[in-house]
Swiss-Prot record:
<feature type="domain" description="TIR">
    <location>
        <begin position="673"/>
        <end position="816"/>
    </location>
</feature>
<feature type="glycosylation site" description="N-linked (GlcNAc...) asparagine">
    <location>
        <position position="309"/>
    </location>
</feature>
<feature type="repeat" description="LRR 8">
    <location>
        <begin position="352"/>
        <end position="373"/>
    </location>
</feature>
<keyword id="KW-0732">Signal</keyword>
<dbReference type="GO" id="GO:0050829">
    <property type="term" value="P:defense response to Gram-negative bacterium"/>
</dbReference>
<dbReference type="Pfam" id="PF12799">
    <property type="entry name" value="LRR_4"/>
</dbReference>
<feature type="disulfide bond">
    <location>
        <begin position="281"/>
        <end position="306"/>
    </location>
</feature>
<protein>
    <recommendedName>
        <fullName>Toll-like receptor 4</fullName>
    </recommendedName>
</protein>
<feature type="glycosylation site" description="N-linked (GlcNAc...) asparagine">
    <location>
        <position position="282"/>
    </location>
</feature>
<feature type="disulfide bond">
    <location>
        <begin position="583"/>
        <end position="609"/>
    </location>
</feature>
<feature type="disulfide bond">
    <location>
        <begin position="390"/>
        <end position="391"/>
    </location>
</feature>
<dbReference type="InterPro" id="IPR017241">
    <property type="entry name" value="Toll-like_receptor"/>
</dbReference>
<feature type="repeat" description="LRR 3">
    <location>
        <begin position="103"/>
        <end position="124"/>
    </location>
</feature>
<keyword id="KW-0812">Transmembrane</keyword>
<dbReference type="GO" id="GO:0005769">
    <property type="term" value="C:early endosome"/>
</dbReference>
<dbReference type="GO" id="GO:0045087">
    <property type="term" value="P:innate immune response"/>
</dbReference>
<keyword id="KW-0395">Inflammatory response</keyword>
Length: 841
């Protein structure tokens, strides 16, 4: 039975939530929970849709036009547990309408103008626990056929036309009834006969709500010896006299909770005399609540004398002329003062008080010390209070305090380290302004503290020992504060038992790698609304028991280059929504991980790309790996192409003149040479070339036409082009005049390198080396290739003597004639016995 109640209680709020989160079309209704819950509200239905599954447990048909409910109208839904028929203009309910609904626990008929309700209308409801018949034109409980509903716990018939409080005899068949709501009916008088059934069959757990009934009279002795769990009388009386008389009529009642007063928007009493409550001396009350009463007249010193022995007293929006009524040492254990017009904080001295709630009293700004030696629970929320030197046992007059709530107040200066308050288990400062929290380890003595909330307290955390001493802490909430350099340091060293940590809205940009190393018991971590740029899984690896991680509303683009499997194994809920994801191939691994972890990620469908622009506001799940494969291929081909072009370009640039030479060889390869030799020399040696080389070769027999740059190069053409086209291509031989100046000239070396290529490409080409002067080997070795050639090949060496000259010119002419085609006239003066060339050593 209890299981059905729990299911109904869970399904009712679930409808509102899930209808927003998981709704899908189930024409014409909305499927809230597949095969379980369906919402058919405001669809202008005249009958129940045929396509609702037989397994449905919760069905909302409110605001339709069903009008007439016939026999076995809902027999197609034997599993139904909650049925809402609010405002369906139902006028007739026949016998056995709900027959077959053996599991139905909640039935709501609110707002139906019922004209005909058959005696067997509710037959078959063997498990019904809650029946709501608000605004159903009910005029008497005698006409309501519910006597057989033995499992009924809650009956709500408020806002009807019931004139009599007489409880029918069938109430003796409702042993489980716990709540009867008769508020806002037409009940004026209550007589002994009306509650006779309660004398015969006590309903000890029954709570009655008679608010907003125009009560004029309660017969004395009506409730004598009756025990009730609760009675609510709010906005019932037109005058203080009527209220006083009716309270006196309650004499003899034993009640757990009595509520008197008015509603905020339903005020009837113009004044309140302290004598009104004198009748309470004849009642046995455990808990008393009085609400929305003001303009007390007379001295209120004895106002609560008849409530001296109650355990719980609650004052809601009560305007007391002075505080004298609260200054006596009553036996109260629980006192609530909510939104009352006090000018200053009450100086209480209640030796038995264990729980004190003093909230929403906006006119009080200063705190007054009080003496409450038994106090364990203190709630001072929303009072605009300021504290200087908070907190110690001297402030509250007790060393037994376990719960302290100072949230939503003004400035609280922590000048003490909670001396004498070592038993504290719950401490809440949220939305108050904390000062001096970084001065020292203010929580050092709170080794029993389980819950700490310093959210939105304008704290900038600098001191790393701020949480020293909190070895038993389970929950820490510190949202809305800031850290030095926007870095979360290692400040949780001693919090080894922490299970819940809230760091949201702390403007965090970085987290120290060891920040969470001590939190081996952590199960819930909220890092939302910060400025984190990446999902660093290594941070959370030590959190072996972590189940819930919220990183939403950050600036996360991707995960760091880590193994995403480092996330704790127990993690079942990860929120990464509202981040700046970069849906690019560079982060392909992370994006694929998002797709693979849809069950772990909350709202994975709502994870949107922030860049690139063509994917902005597109779902992360829409990213395709194939795009990256194509991109990789394109990039690879492009890179290879660029490399090849670059290499070719470099080679062409480096060997440009060699290529020109090659092209020229093909062009001039078969033609006659214009020159016998192209002379390569240093400008420093030009006198020797003109006076010796040119004179002896061009004027000698046979004559040899030489190609000289100063004479034969074409003006306006690049030097390199002249060297190749006029020098090498039109000459049979190349004469290289080697000297110290030659070796030091870059142009000479360049011409020499081209000459080597020319010799390689042309089969008839030849290079004749003339060493003009003795060369130092150290200088010659600077040109490795030239040194190697002179070491391995013959060359001519100039000697300025008669014999040396004769031998030099004879050998040079012979070298120039080698490979030259024979003319018809022959070469009569060609040498026939050339002397061997010398070889350098």
């Amino acid at each position: 039975m209890m299981a059905r109640v729990r299911l109904a209680a869970a399904l009712i709020p679930a409808t509102a939530i899930l209808s927003c989160l998981r709704t899908e079309s189930w024409d014409p209704c909305v499927q809230v929970v597949p095969n379980i819950s369906y919402q058919c509200m405001e669809l202008n239905l005249y009958k129940i849709p045929d396509n609702i599954p037989i397994s449905t447990k919760m069905l909302d048909l409110s605001f339709n036009y069903l009008r007439h409910l016939g026999s076995h109208n809902f027999s197609s839904f034997p599993e139904l547990q909650v049925l809402d028929l609010s405002r369906c203009e139902i006028k007739i309910i026949e016998d056995d309408t709900f027959q077959g609904l053996n599991h139905l626990s909640t039935l709501i008929l609110t707002g139906n103008p019922i004209q005909s309700l058959a005696w067997g209308a509710f037959s078959g409801l063997s498990s019904l626990q809650k029946l709501v018949a608000v605004e159903t034109n009910l005029v008497s409980l005698n006409d309501f056929p519910i006597g057989h509903l033995k499992t009924l716990k809650e009956l709500n018939v408020a806002h009807n036309f019931i004139h009599s409080f007489k409880l029918p005899e069938y109430f003796s068949n409702l042993p489980n009834l716990e709540h009867l709501d008769l508020s806002n009916n037409k009940i004026q008088n209550i007589y002994y006969e009306d509650v006779k059934v309660l004398h015969q069959m006590p309903l000890l757990n029954l709570s009655l709500d008679l608010s907003l009934n125009p009560l004029d009279f309660i017969e004395p002795g009506t409730f004598k010896e009756i025990k009730l769990n609760g009675l609510t009388l709010r906005s019932n009386f037109n005058s203080s006299h009527v209220m006083k008389t009716c309270i006196q009529g309650l004499a003899g009642l034993k009640i757990n909770r009595l509520v008197l007063g008015e509603f905020k928007n339903e005020r009837k009493l113009k004044g309140f005399d302290r004598s009104i409550l004198e009748g309470l001396c004849n009642l046995t009350i455990e808990q008393f609540r009085i609400a929305y009463l003001d303009e007390f007249s007379g001295d209120d010193t004895d106002l609560f004398n008849c409530l001296e022995n109650v355990s719980v007293i609650s004052l809601l929006s009560v305007s007391l002329g002075s505080l004298q009524a609260l200054l006596k040492d009553f036996r109260w254990q629980h006192l609530e003062i909510i939104n009352c017009d006090f000018d200053k904080f009450p100086a209480l001295k209640l030796s038995s008080l264990k729980k004190f709630v003093f909230t929403d009293n906006k006119d009080i700004s200063s705190f007054t010390e009080f003496q409450l030696p038994s106090l364990q629970y203190l709630d001072l929320r929303r009072n605009h209070l300021s504290f200087k030197g908070c907190c110690s046992h001297a402030d509250f007059g007790t060393t037994n305090l376990k719960h302290l709530d100072l949230s939503f107040n003004d400035v609280i200066t922590l000048g003490s380290n909670f001396m004498g308050l070592e038993k504290l288990e719950h401490l809440d400062f949220q939305h108050s302004t904390l000062k001096q929290i970084n001065a020292f380890s203010v929580f050092l003595s709170l080794r029993n503290l389980r819950y700490l909330d310093i959210s939105y307290t304008n704290v900038r955390i600098v001191f790393h020992g701020i949480f020293t001493g909190l070895v038993s802490l389970k929950t820490l909430k510190m949202a809305g504060n800031t850290f030095q350099d926007n870095l979360l340091p290692d400040i949780f060293t001693e919090l080894t038992n922490l299970t819940v940590l809230d760091l949201s809205k702390c403007q965090l940009e970085q987290v120290a790698q060891t920040a969470f190393h001590s939190l081996s018991s952590l199960q819930v971590l909220n890092m939302s609304h910060n400025k984190l740029l990446s999902l660093d899984t290594f941070l959370y690896e030590p959190l072996h028991l972590l189940r819930i991680l919220d990183c939403s509303f950050n600036r996360i683009m991707d995960s760091k280059e880590q193994d995403l499997q480092n996330l704790p194994r127990n993690l079942t809920w990860l929120n990464l929504t509202q981040n700046a994801f970069a849906c690019v191939c560079e982060h392909q691994r992370f994006l694929q991980w998002v797709k693979d972890q849809r069950q772990l990620l909350v709202g994975a469908e709502q994870m949107m790309c922030a860049e690139p622009l063509d994917m902005k506001d597109m779902p992360v799940l829409s990213f395709r790996n194939a795009t990256c494969q194509m991109s990789k291929m394109i990039i690879s081909v492009s890179v290879v192409t660029v490399l090849l072009v670059s290499v070719v370009g470099v080679l062409v640039y480096k060997f440009y003149f060699h290529l020109m030479l090659l092209a020229g060889c093909k062009k001039y390869g078969r033609g006659e040479s214009t020159y016998g030799a192209f002379v390569i020399y240093s400008s420093q040696d030009e006198d020797w070339v003109r006076n010796e080389l040119v004179k002896n070769l061009e004027e000698g027999v046979p004559p040899f036409q030489l190609c000289l740059h100063y004479r034969d190069f074409i003006p306006g053409v690049a030097i390199a082009a002249n060297i190749i086209q006029e020098g090498f291509h039109k000459s049979r031989k190349v004469i290289v005049v080697v000297s110290q100046h030659f070796i030091q000239s870059r142009w000479c070396i360049f011409e020499y390198e081209i000459a080597q290529t020319w010799q390689f490409l042309s089969s008839r080409a030849g290079i004749i080396f003339i060493v003009l002067q003795k060369l130092e080997k150290s200088l010659l070795r600077q040109q490795v290739e030239l040194y190697r050639l002179l070491s391995r090949n013959t060359y001519l060496e100039w000697e300025d003597s008669v014999l040396g000259r004769h031998v030099f010119w004879r050998r040079l002419r012979k070298a120039l004639l080698a490979g030259k085609p024979q003319s018809p006239e022959g070469t009569a003066d060609a040498e026939t016995n050339p002397q061997e060339a010398t070889t350098s050593t």
